[in-house]
């Protein structure tokens, strides 16, 4: 059975068509009692160490929705100060977009300037801490450019503070501004003052705008594990343990693996985003990827989940939603 997912995002119903054909399956069936038991035992042990308001929710149905977006900008965290002082633990404050330190300050700046672009609402911005793969964390040099990996561009851009505004305009498909002398039409009058939509016009960006920003191509799959510890302790604990499990089981072969800041659904931790790189569209030259979001991923079921996805099967029990990109 080919799986096409229906969900409600931005108050609209949409159907996600993937570049690959996935089969929807259930893995917690009669033959997988051991896996079910291992997951229950793990959740129970973790919940015993957490206060009541921060326990994992193991009973409620998973929300069947993910953000609607076209691009994902991932700001790479700096190198760890030491093995005991992890950057994502110490410097990912709860509201990371308010962090004034470079390069994290670029997160809030990008979000602000993306509001004034054509497609800015379709761009997600997060921080990531690289664990393994073919990308390296930037140095702690205060003059270092911010390293930003953009999906589905599959490019690592290196952005200086003075380039932030133009880079945001590039990400968002061009700068927009309100028409200053907009005259109310009779149709506007009938709508009422509170319902008039401000008209905007697009300030054209050069078609080769990306050439102005130093970048490297990197076309491979990604595993992103939510580990925003200062936002929610559950993700901090599970993020670290899932990353350790990926390393211990060798699940990172030919993939980039990283911890990612807040992606929602903390009570359903652990949360994963998988970006499966499919290839390049022969007609458009654009990169094609499938974006798959999962929750309730624990060390006991992590390997089984990734094996199923590699076999083009989506486990219902953990699936939140997804879509194709490009």
Curated annotation (Swiss-Prot):
| Domain of life of the native organism | Eukaryota
Which Gene3D superfamilies does the protein's record reference? Glutaredoxin
Q: Which family does it belong to?
A: Belongs to the AIM32 family.
Instruction: Report the protein name in the record.
Output: Altered inheritance of mitochondria protein 32
Organism listed in the record: Zygosaccharomyces rouxii (strain ATCC 2623 / CBS 732 / NBRC 1130 / NCYC 568 / NRRL Y-229)
**Which gene specifies this protein's sequence?**
AIM32
